[in-house]
C-alpha cells in the first residue's frame, strides 16, 4: 500500500493516507522528511520497550546487522560510546542524543539510524517501536523491518 499523508509525506506499508496504522503485519515504512520511519507495533508498555531498545547487551539478539557490542554503558545515554561488530568488523559508535523514549547514533563517525518509541493514547500496554533510516540508506529499511519483528518478539515474550 502506498499513499500520501497531508504535507506530502509518502506512506508505505500499512498506514492509511491520514497516517494511522492499519491491520496486516503491524509494520510500516513512512517517509518523514529526509528519513524513512520503519515502525512496528509492540504489545508491551512503552517504558519497557524503550528500555529494551536502549539495552546494548540485547542489540545482537534482535538486530540482524549487529554481531556484537562492546560498551561501558549497558543502557545508552547521550555520549555513550563503544563499538559494534557489523559484517565481521568492529566499528566505533557514539550516541549523539538520548532521552527516555528516543536515541540517535553515529557509527564509524557517520550519522546512522534513530530509534524511538511512540505511545498510543489510552493503551498503556501497547506502543510502536520505530527505526529512522536516512533516505540515502533506504535499502537498509527491510533489515530494519526484520529487526523490529525480532525485537517485538523478544519484548512481547517477557
What positions do the PLM features span?
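Short, surface-exposed coil-to-beta transition loops
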Residues: 35-37, 89-92, 111-117
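Hydrophobic ligand-binding cavity/cleft-lining segments
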Residues: 2-73
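Hydrophobic pocket/interface hotspot
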Residues: 49-53, 59, 82, 95, ...
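Short, charged/polar surface micro-motifs in flexible loops or helix N-caps
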Residues: 87-91, 97-102, 110
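Intrinsic-disorder/low-complexity, polar/charged segments enriched in Ser/Thr/Lys/Arg/Asp/Glu/Gln
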Residues: 33-39, 81, 90, 102, ...
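Beta-strand/loop substructures that line and gate deep hydrophobic ligand-binding cavities in soluble
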Residues: 102-158
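Short, hydrophobic/aromatic-rich segments at coil-to-beta transitions
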Residues: 75-83, 98-105
Amino acid at each position: 500500500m502506498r499513499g500520501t499523508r497531508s504535507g506530502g509525506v509518502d506512506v508505505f506499508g500499512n498506514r492509511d493516507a491520514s497516517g494511522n496504522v492499519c491491520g496486516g503485519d503491524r509494520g510500516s515504512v513512512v517517509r518523514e522528511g529526509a528519513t524513512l520511519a520503519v515502525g512496528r507495533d509492540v504489545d508491551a508498555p512503552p517504558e519497557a520497550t524503550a528500555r529494551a531498545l536502549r539495552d546494548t547487551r540485547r542489540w545482537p539478539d534482535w538486530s540482524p546487522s549487529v554481531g556484537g557490542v562492546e560498551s561501558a554503558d549497558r543502557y545508552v545515554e547521550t555520549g555513550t560510546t563503544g563499538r559494534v561488530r557489523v559484517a565481521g568488523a568492529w566499528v566505533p559508535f557514539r550516541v549523539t542524543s538520548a532521552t527516555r523514549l528516543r536515541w540517535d547514533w553515529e557509527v564509524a563517525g557517520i550519522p546512522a539510524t534513530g530509534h524511538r518509541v511512540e505511545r498510543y493514547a489510552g493503551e498503556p500496554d501497547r506502543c510502536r517501536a520505530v527505526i529512522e533510516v536516512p533516505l540515502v540508506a533506504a535499502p537498509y529499511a527491510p533489515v530494519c523491518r526484520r529487526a523490529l519483528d525480532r525485537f517485538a518478539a523478544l519484548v512481547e515474550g517477557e
